Regions:
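Flexible, membrane-facing loop/turn or short amphipathic-helix motifs
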Residues: 802-803
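Short beta-strand elements
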Residues: 824-835
Length: 835
C-alpha cells in the first residue's frame, strides 16, 4: 500500500498546478495522516531538512543558508554583501541575484533558501548588518521583494528573516528588542510586509530575540495576529535554528521548529491535545502550510528538472552588483579615476590588501568558486601603464603569500614536494587511518563535504607531515587558519596550539630557525561538525621597521590603503566596534602624512568612525564585502573603466554620540555592552527610544550633520534634475498621485543616478521631515535626458494610528522631495489630500 500511495503522489505532481488542486491534495494527505505523522512534520531533521512522510510517499525537502549564495554543497556563486546590493539602489539587480541563487538551488536540489536577510540597520555595530539592506524600510522592502521574486521564479522558496527587530548580535537569544507600536509597524515590520505582499515570499523565519519581552518564535501577536491574519500570509513560519524556548510556540503561530523539534514534538503536543490546551485544528493548520508551500513550489516532485547553471553568467551578476554597489565617498580634486601621466607609480598596503575578505562571518559566508584580492586585481588592471607595488605593513604576511612561499617535501632528502596526509574517521587522530595522499599545500575549504574518499564529512581528523630547510637563519612565522582545531609541531615541539571547536580563526606563532638545517613539520587538524577548513603556511619574519617601509611612499604618485574588518571581526553571533582598530587608523594617518594622494579602500558592513583621517585623505571608496567579484570592480572604478554609482543605504554619523541608537546600544562607541543578561532568569531589553526616528529621520529631525548622509554617493559625472510634475495636485484619501521628473547627464562620462523620492506629510500627526517612498536608477550617456515616473499610492502615504491600531492616510499637505541623497534635495512640490 505504501508503494501504491507513493506512486500516486508521483503521478499527481505534474498536475498540481492550481491552488484548488493543491488544496485538494493537502486535504487528502491530512485525512490520511495520523496525528503522530502530522506532529513529526513540525520539526526539522538532519540539520537542514523538512521531514517527509514515507508512508504517503512524501519526501524530505532540503534547505540551505543563505542570503549571499548557497552555503551548502560545496562552492557556489558568492554574491556581494546584502548591504552592497542595497547600495546599488537597483531593483532589477536584486531580482537577478535572487534568480541566480534560485537556479543554483535547483541544481543542488535545494527547496528552501534561507534568504533574504532584511533586518533594519539600527546601529553600525550590529555584526550582521553586512547581510541586510540598510536603515530604511522602503529600500529594504523593495530590494527584498525583488530578490524574493527572483528566487521563487525558479520554484524555490525564499525565506525572509529574521522576523523581527533582530538588530544586534550581542546576546541575541535573550536581549529583548523593546519597540513601540508605531515604530514596529512603520520601520521594523514594513519591509517584511512588502517582501510578503508584493514579493510573495512563502516562508518567514522568526528571530532569536524576544520582542517586547516575548521571544519572536513564541509571540502570538507577531506570528498570528499581524503576519497571518492582518497580512493574510498563507505560507509557513519556521524558527531560526534553536530559537524556540518553550511549548508556547505551538499556539503562537510557529509552524516548523528548526533544526529539530525540541518542543514541538509528540512528547509535548499529544498531552496538550488531550488536555485541550492545543486544538487539532492548530496542528492541521501547521501541516497544511508546510504541505501547501512545498506543493506550490513542486518540491515533492522527484523528477524536478535541474537546470544547467551558467556559472559565468552568475559571476557576471555578482560582478555587476559589486560595480554598482561600491560607493565613492570622497574624491578631492578629482584624483579618481587614476590616469597617466599624473599618476604612474602606485603603492598598495594595509591589512585587507592581500587578505581581502569576500564576506562577513557566519551563516551568510559562501565558498566562492573564483576570487581575486585587491592587490592582484589592481596590478592586473594597471598593466604596463602603471607600476604597482605591494608593501606589507603587517607583522605577518597574508595567508595567500604564506601559502605561495611555503616549500615542504614529503621526504627528509627534500626530493618529493608536498605533505604526506593521513585521514582518520575520528577527531582524535587514532588509528587505523582510512585514507592517505600527498598534498602540495594545505589550503582547503572542505565545507560540508568529505575531505577525501572514504572519510566522513564531519568528525574526522587529518595529520600532515613534511620536511623543510630554511633559506636563511632568523625568526619565522607559522600561521594556521582553521575550523575546528589545529596544532603545529616543528621537530616535535608544539609551536601553535588552537585545539578546540570554533569558527574559522587565524593563529600565528614565531620560532627561530637555522639556515640549511632540515626540520620536521607536523600539522594535526580535526573537524567535529559543520563546515571544515584549514590553511597553513610559514615564511621568514620581515622585521623591517614600519617607519622604514612607509618612508618609501614618498617615491610613489599615489598610495592605496586597504583597511576595514573581516569575517572574524564582523559576523554572526557578535557585534563589532564602530571605530577601526587603532593601528589601522594610525596607518592611514601616517600614509596620508607622507603621500598626499592617499586613497582608502574600506571593507565593512556599514559605517565607521571616519573622523581620525577623513580630512587627510584624498579619496575613499566604501567597498563593503564584494563576494567573489573581489578586487576586480574596485580596480575598474579606480582606473575609470566603471563609473561609480553606489549610494549609501545607511547614514554615517560623525561620532557615535550623534547616532539615533546612542545611549541604548553601546556606551561611547566602546565594544562593551551596556546591558548584561542572565538569560531566562533575568531577561533584559534594549529600549528603542528613537522610535520612528531611525537613520536619516533622526539626523533630519534633530538637525545633526552626518559624516555621510543616507543615499549619498559620488560619480565621475554630474546630473541635473528638472521639471517636477504632480498629477493630480489634489486627491482624496484613497487617491493616487503620479510623479514625474527629468534627469540629465551634464557631465562628460556615461553614468547612472539613483533618484530618490521622499515625502514629508504636513499633517497633525508628527512625522519625520522626510521619508523615502520610492526610488529608481537611471543610466544616461553624456548629454542624455530621461523622464522618470513614480506612483504614490495610498499605501505609501499611510501613517500607523496607535489609538485605533490601524493604518490611515491623514488629510493635509504633502511635499514631494526628489533628491540625489537625503541631504541633497533637488526638486520640491506639494499636493493636497482632502478630508
Amino acid at each position: 500500500m505504501k508503494r501504491i500511495l507513493g506512486l500516486i503522489v508521483l503521478f499527481l505532481m505534474p498536475v498540481l498546478s492550481t491552488a484548488a488542486n493543491i488544496e485538494r491534495q493537502v486535504n487528502a494527505w491530512l485525512a490520511q495522516m495520523t496525528m503522530e505523522e502530522k506532529i513529526e512534520l513540525l520539526g526539522g531533521t538532519k540539520g537542514f531538512f523538512i521531514k517527509g512522510v514515507p508512508r504517503l510517499g512524501i519526501p524530505e525537502v532540503k534547505m540551505s543558508d543563505g542570503p549571499l549564495g548557497i552555503r551548502a554543497n560545496g562552492k557556489s556563486t558568492a554574491f556581494p554583501a546584502g548591504i552592497a546590493l542595497a547600495a546599488t539602489w537597483n531593483k532589477h539587480l536584486a531580482f537577478e541575484e535572487g534568480n541566480a541563487i534560485g537556479q543554483e538551488c535547483r541544481e543542488k536540489n535545494i527547496g528552501f533558501i534561507l534568504a533574504p536577510a532584511m533586518n533594519i540597520y539600527r546601529a553600525a555595530m550590529d555584526g550582521r548588518n553586512f547581510e541586510y539592506f540598510g536603515e530604511d524600510p522602503c529600500l529594504t522592502g523593495q530590494t527584498a521583494a525583488n530578490y524574493v521574486q527572483g528566487v521563487q521564479k525558479n520554484k524555490v522558496v525564499a525565506t525572509v528573516k529574521h522576523f523581527v527587530a533582530n538588530n544586534q548580535e550581542y546576546d541575541r537569544h535573550w536581549v529583548s528588542s523593546n519597540v513601540d507600536e508605531r515604530a514596529l509597524r512603520e520601520i521594523y515590520l514594513a519591509g517584511f510586509k512588502t517582501a510578503i505582499q508584493q514579493g510573495g515570499a512563502l516562508a518567514v523565519m522568526s528571530a532569536y530575540n524576544p520582542l517586547n519581552g516575548i521571544h519572536c518564535s513564541e509571540n502570538k501577536t507577531l506570528l498570528t495576529k499581524i503576519l497571518k491574519k492582518q497580512w493574510g500570509f498563507t505560507g509557513l513560519v519556521m524558527s531560526d535554528w534553536g530559537a524556540v524556548h518553550s511549548t508556547a510556540a505551538i499556539n503562537a503561530g510557529l509552524d516548523l521548529e528548526m533544526p529539530r523539534a525540541r518542543y514541538m514534538n509528540k512528547e509535548n503536543i499529544i498531552p496538550l491535545l488531550k488536555a485541550g490546551k492545543v486544538d487539532t485544528a492548530t496542528i492541521d493548520d501547521k501541516v497544511r502550510r508546510i504541505l501547501r508551500v512545498c506543493l506550490t513550489m513542486d518540491l515533492f516532485n522527484p523528477n524536478r528538472e535541474k537546470p544547467a547553471v551558467d556559472w559565468d553568467a552568475h559571476h557576471q551578476v555578482a560582478l555587476n552588483i559589486a560595480r554598482e554597489g561600491i560607493v565613492l565617498l570622497k574624491n578631492e580634486d578629482d584624483l579618481l579615476p587614476l590616469s597617466a601621466p599624473a599618476i604612474k607609480t602606485i603603492a598598495i598596503l594595509g591589512p585587507n590588501a592581500e587578505d581581502t575578505p569576500s564576506s562577513g562571518g557566519g551563516s551568510a559566508h559562501v565558498k566562492p568558486y573564483r576570487f581575486v584580492n585587491f592587490v592582484d586585481a589592481i596590478t592586473k588592471r594597471a598593466g604596463t601603464n602603471f607600476k604597482v607595488t605591494f608593501i606589507n605593513t603587517n607583522r605577518y604576511p597574508s595567508f595567500a603569500r604564506l601559502i605561495r612561499q611555503t616549500r615542504v617535501f614529503s621526504d627528509p632528502q627534500l626530493k618529493t614536494p608536498g605533505y604526506t596526509a593521513v585521514f582518520f574517521n575520528n577527531t582524535r587522530l587514532t588509528f587505523p587511518p582510512v585514507a592517505r595522499r600527498v598534498d602540495p599545500s594545505i589550503n582547503f575549504d572542505f565545507g560540508a563535504l568529505a575531505p577525501a574518499f572514504g572519510v566522513r564529512s564531519q568528525n574526522y581528523s587529518i595529520r600532515w607531515r613534511g620536511f623543510f630547510k630554511p633559506s636563511k637563519s632568523g625568526k619565522y612565522v607559522f600561521a594556521a587558519e582553521s575550523d575546528d582545531g589545529v596544532r603545529v609541531y616543528v621537530n616535535g615541539e608544539l609551536v601553535l596550539d588552537n585545539w578546540s571547536d570554533h569558527a574559522p580563526e587565524k593563529r600565528f606563532a614565531e620560532k627561530a630557525l637555522k639556515k640549511g638545517k632540515v626540520y620536521r613539520l607536523r600539522i594535526d587538524y580535526y573537524n567535529s561538525h559543520g563546515g571544515g577548513m584549514i590553511r597553513f603556511g610559514f615564511a621568514p619574519l620581515d622585521e623591517t621597521p614600519l617607519s622604514t617601509k612607509l618612508a618609501a611612499l614618498k617615491n610613489y604618485d599615489a598610495a592605496i590603503v586597504c583597511v576595514g574588518f573581516n569575517a572574524q571581526v564582523e559576523g554572526e553571533g557578535h557585534d563589532r566596534p564602530f571605530a577601526l582598530p587603532k593601528e589601522q587608523n594610525e596607518l592611514v594617518q601616517k600614509v596620508s602624512a607622507i603621500n598626499k594622494h592617499t586613497i582608502v579602500l574600506l571593507t565593512a558592513g556599514g559605517g565607521i568612525d571616519f573622523s581620525p583621517w577623513i580630512d587627510e585623505v584624498q579619496a575613499v571608496l566604501h567597498t563593503f564585502y564584494l563576494g567573489q567579484a573581489g578586487g576586480t570592480p574596485v580596480a575598474e572604478i579606480l582606473f575609470g573603466d566603471v563609473n561609480p554609482s553606489g549610494k549609501l543605504p545607511f547614514s554615517v554619523p560623525k561620532r557615535w554620540q550623534d547616532a539615533p541608537a546612542y545611549g541604548h546600544y553601546y556606551p561611547e562607541g566602546e565594544a562593551g555592552p551596556i546591558y548584561k543578561s542572565n538569560h531566562k532568569d533575568h531577561p533584559v531589553g534594549v529600549n528603542y527610544d528613537e522610535s520612528i526616528l531611525t537613520g536619516y529621520r533622526h539626523y533630519d529631525q534633530l538637525k545633526i550633520e552626518p559624516q555621510f548622509p543616507f543615499g549619498f554617493g559620488l560619480s565621475y559625472t554630474q546630473f541635473e534634475y528638472s521639471d517636477l510634475q504632480l498629477s493630480p495636485r489634489q486627491i482624496e484619501k484613497d487617491g493616487t498621485v503620479t510623479v514625474r521628473c527629468k534627469v540629465k547627464n551634464i557631465g562628460s562620462r556615461a553614468g547612472a543616478e539613483a533618484v530618490q523620492l521622499y515625502i514629508h506629510a504636513e499633517t497633525r500627526v508628527p512625522t519625520p521631515p522626510k521619508e523615502l517612498k520610492d526610488f529608481d536608477k537611471v543610466y544616461l550617456k553624456p548629454g542624455e535626458e530621461k523622464t522618470l515616473t513614480f506612483t504614490l499610492t495610498p499605501e505609501k502615504l499611510q501613517i500607523y494610528n496607535i489609538q485605533n491600531h490601524e493604518w490611515e492616510v491623514k488629510a493635509g499637505k504633502y511635499e514631494v522631495l526628489i533628491g540625489a541623497s537625503s541631504r541633497d534635495i533637488r526638486l520640491k512640490k506639494r499636493f493636497l489630500v482632502t478630508p
